[in-house]
Amino acid sequence: EIKKIEEEYAKTETPVVSNNSAHRWTPDVPMVVPELNPEHLEVIADQKKRLGTTRGFIVVKPNCSIQSYTPALHALKKAGYEPKTVVATTYQAISGAGKTFKDWPEMEHNIIPFIGGEEEKSEQEPLRIWGHVENGQIVKAEGPVITTQCIRVPVQDGHTAAVFMTFEEGKKPSKEEIIRVWREFSGMPQELGLPNAPKHFIQYLEEDNRPQVSLDVNYENGFGVSLGRLREDTVFDYKFVGLSHNTVRGAAGGAVLIAELLKAKGYITAK
């Protein structure tokens, strides 16, 4: 069992940064996007007590599917604009399944409207990122209510999301304010100048036909998030499109950035 394997590594006094989902809901294991919830790292002290370690611990990454829209929602929350309801449809690249077109030829000219387990992760994991620390554990947030559909599309790299959001009554920001919040948002990796931290975490593109995978997936070397097409909606308050690199920001690269943050904050030290 992966949970057990990761704990065994940690018990050898080895810090573990994992892309696997096994420990994402273990109460004293932080699930971190470095710009969004670095404060969750404080539960590591309690986790070490449970594991009986001095240097070893586990930190995990959230699912790649949520990286294209959770930063956009988080920036608004931090600015005092709480989304109440969110609908997101993700269009996910085949590399997210560890595949290429060579070994998954049936994906050419095809769309598959189901990815096992992704919708549950996409709806629940943002709530854990927005949770709070209580008695050495992370307690997930109550809202917003998120519903998702996750679709596999014939693209090698890059997860796109079409997102609809409604705010609390009387707390709907203007379009200009939302774009300002997105463009100005930064987090601890930017403050600390971590080696792989994007200079500008979020870019907003004004063109109607952006973001595009072929043009924007490698924004900030794949560590940034590209947003566009923000406009008012007839059912919800606003809709927009997000794009992130699923294997850089969403997987291995994001894990490296977490390791850089852990070192900068003194959690990873020389033996």
Q: Model-found features: residue ranges?
A:
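N-terminal start-of-chain detector that recognizes signal peptides
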Residues: V60-K61, L127-V139, A197-F201, P211-D216
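Proteins with a high burden of low-complexity, intrinsically disordered sequence enriched in S/T/G/P/A and R
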Residues: E1, I5-E7, K11-E13, I129, ...
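Hydrophobic alpha-helical scaffolding
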Residues: P62, I112-G117, H245-V248
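Generic hydrophobic, helix-prone segments enriched in Leu/Val/Ile
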Residues: V43-K49, S122, K199-L205
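C-terminal active-site/capping subdomain that shapes the small-molecule cofactor and substrate pocket
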Residues: T148-R152, D157-K271
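Active-site-lining helix/loop region of Rossmann-like oxidoreductase modules
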Residues: G52-R55, Q67-Q190
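N-terminal Rossmann-like NAD(P) cofactor-binding subdomain of oxidoreductases
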Residues: E1-M107, I111, V145, V225-S226, ...
